[in-house]
Amino acid sequence: MYYKIDLSNYEPREVPAYQEFTNYNDISSEQIQVISEELAEFKDSFGKDWQEWNLKDLRSRLKDNWTFYLTECGWCFIDWNRKYPYLCNRYIIPEYRNKGLGSDLVWLRCNEIKQQGYNYASIKLEDWNKPALSVMKENIFTKMD
């Protein structure tokens, strides 16, 4: 289900340290290695193999007006090419899951979107993904048609 996020009254939140990339060449070889290893072991919430994207996709996305955010515990993207900036591909490394870090990845992107002057964003949240739905307790999400 796609949701519109109303950020018109949003106050920026404190989030863990992260790095922001809009150019693939700015990502260090060590970071690429860690990302590659994690992608090789990429599992969905049910522990099944899942390949949402790869390093070629990362390079293409960064050339196509996306932003990649990397933290110690995971990563996420913003696709700036839509009517509302789209929060997509949030991933938490398994040993860090169920600690609220997924919500932090939502809030760091909301902080960025608000800082860039937008009042709305969008996100896809699946009904089966209970940890991802935890952000819904905030009263800023409305279903999109």
Model-derived segments and their meaning:
Residues 113-125:
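Conserved GNAT acetyl-CoA-binding A-motif
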